[in-house]
Design a protein with these regions (language model features):
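Substrate-binding groove/exosite segments of carbohydrate-active enzymes
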Residues: 1-96
Length: 96
């Protein structure tokens, strides 16, 4: 998952967990869910300061220290819906 010690909150992270439910390995989701929980705390500040919004957000790149602002080029680095994208894994777990 790591790209220079960061997580890319797009298909690069999610595809590592796709098999967890269908493979009867739901407990393997726990680290991702814990990470999403921690990220949401840091992403609350980003949503407020950068976008003037309530809730939380993250962009394409994030790390274990809670980095959530956009980085890199606009083409791939600006993805303020990454939090929604990664949260779909929570919903998939619920549906399963």
């Amino acid at each position: 998952m790591g790209w220079t010690n960061d997580y890319h909150l797009d298909i690069n992270t999610q595809q590592n967990y796709w098999v967890s439910n269908v493979g009867n390995l739901a407990e393997c989701n726990t680290p991702l869910f814990n990470y999403i929980k921690d990220l949401s705390v840091h992403g609350t500040k980003t949503a407020e300061v950068v976008y003037g919004c309530k809730g939380w957000t993250a962009n394409t790149t994030a790390n274990i220290w809670g980095y959530t602002p956009a980085s890199g080029t606009i083409i791939w680095g600006l993805f303020p819906l990454a939090s929604s994208w990664i949260a779909t894994h929570l919903w998939t777990q619920y549906e399963y």
